[in-house]
Amino acid sequence: MNIRQQLTQFLSLAYVFTSAFVIWKSLGIITNSHSPIVVVLSGSMEPAFQRGDILFLWNRDQEAKVGDIVVYEIQGRNIPIVHRVLREHHNSDKQLLLTKGDNNAVDDLGLYAKKQKYLNQKTDLVGSVKAYLPKLGYVTILITENVYFKYGMLGLMCISTLLTNE
Amino acid sequence: MFNLVTRGQAVANQALTSSVFIIVTIVAITLARLYQDNVWSIDTTSIGAISPSASIKYSFNYGSTNRQPKENAKIQFDLDADLTSLFNWNTKQVFVYVTAEYPGKSDGSSNRVTFWDKIIVSKEDAKLHLVNQRSKYSVWDVEKSFRGREAVVRLEWNIQPHIGPLIFGETEATATFNFAEIEKKKKKKEQKVEKVEPVVEEIKEEVKEEVKEEPIPEPVQQAQQAQEVEEEPVQEPLDEVPIQ
Amino acid sequence: MSSNKKVNLNSVADLRQNTDDNLPAALEGLGYEESFKLVDTKIALGLSTVAIAGGLFAIDKKYDFKESYWITVAALAVYFVISLVMLVVNNQNKNVKYIGYSSKGKKITIAAWTTKYDPIYHVKVTFNDDPKSTTTAELPFAKFFDLTGYFSRNAFSKLLSSHIEKIEKKDI
């Protein structure tokens, strides 16, 4: 086959992936968050958030407010936690936060690193939740937890691009 | 439209565009409704009869570092609120919370804490009438003590929609109170700390934001100085310039 | 050149794609030599965007968000600039399927498109990039696809050349 034809076909397939990835990275830069869209994985914020809900984050707020729902990661652990700000203390340099899940009986002190008493607003937060879509994220839970589903979806995407000539 | 793939793609495209349109419309309608109901200036609330109390705690779960005394505060209050205007068809739940805002040590520093919160799921439960309600949480400051500072109490709310942006606000009612002070006879309890074995905890590199305690009465200071030698340099209180 | 295969007569897209693929052969028969400059430019631009995306992906894997922030911004900026260039190039060469030069050095540009449900192959022929020497013709697919869906090169070449010669005669 003609190499130009092959390259052109390859490019139209690659376009799907590159544009999706570029959109994701751009969102991250715009929101200043390394994960601007997250899927709720636990039930610690019920009844507000259920497993599978999609949250849209924003990380360019100067300060967090009490009552804000934030996503944070403890240093050294890669698990993002979605909880509400219970208390905040700030001066002109930094802000310290204490969080708690709505569905938990106690605050998050036990979740922080050893001897850590507060979260640092600038360094520990992934972002604060600004908007929410119910349940649609369940697809990603399926993709991460169910291997067949993941490859099935990828396969479908490739096939559909190759078959279209419009 | 002659094969499954093309039909599938066309349907998917249409579904995507329509759902975006629908969501935008829903959000716009919700916001318009809320504006119409004047939810950002709810004045049918009142907070009063605030009676604060204070206690000393020594456990890490109550804010204490190295078993040093830490002042904890609680309040009792009366609350009347009519939050029914926050409920419309797009409201999944309303989270209400009573906050107290008080100043810090330096200029530009401030603190806000939650004493009590509640999740309201339906319009029928949106009328609150609380008498002598005890606070849910035992609250401690970044400093060792509240020093009897004055705090402004507010009732704040957060609407969690079925779809769309989270909406926050506070009601018009405010009240003030001064944090209760611990009576001086508590000094006896503080002296006991001297005999407690210094608890040497593992110092990891990621230790963050250790808050140095306020200057404390003499007898305890010596015990603490012995401990401090073994510890990593403790960071200054929030309201002074942080070391790192 | 694609070997003759059966084309779905119910799909305008398929008919058009197949005809596009046969354009180079047909024009070769008319004495033109294909110029790949446009195609190569598009491919080069496309590959560079893929390269940038690939690089971004590698950086994303290796460094964390804060460290790689400004490099990511720079890479994204370059990506969008290249995409913009591609957009402009595509716009200026809308639907261009073939560019070639005759033995005398005359440049022919052929743009071809279809509307969604009409089985008509619209062809726009331009000589030497001169907007005045342009003809647009409507060639119904029925004229060069037989009943079973096979492309007839002879029928197509004849049809195409008659239109091209019309302008050629005008030019000369």
Swiss-Prot record, chain A:
Taxonomy of the source species: Eukaryota, Fungi, Dikarya, Ascomycota, Saccharomycotina
Record protein name field: Signal peptidase complex catalytic subunit SEC11
Recorded family membership: Belongs to the peptidase S26B family.
Entry comment, domain topic: The C-terminal short (CTS) helix is essential for catalytic activity. It may be accommodated as a transmembrane helix in the thinned membrane environment of the complex, similarly to the signal peptide in the complex substrates.
Organism field: Scheffersomyces stipitis (strain ATCC 58785 / CBS 6054 / NBRC 10063 / NRRL Y-11545)
Annotated keywords: Endoplasmic reticulum, Hydrolase, Membrane, Protease, Signal-anchor, Transmembrane, Transmembrane helix
Gene Ontology, cellular component aspect: signal peptidase complex
Subcellular location: Endoplasmic reticulum membrane
Disulfide bridges in this chain: none
Residue span of region C-terminal short (CTS) helix: 152-163
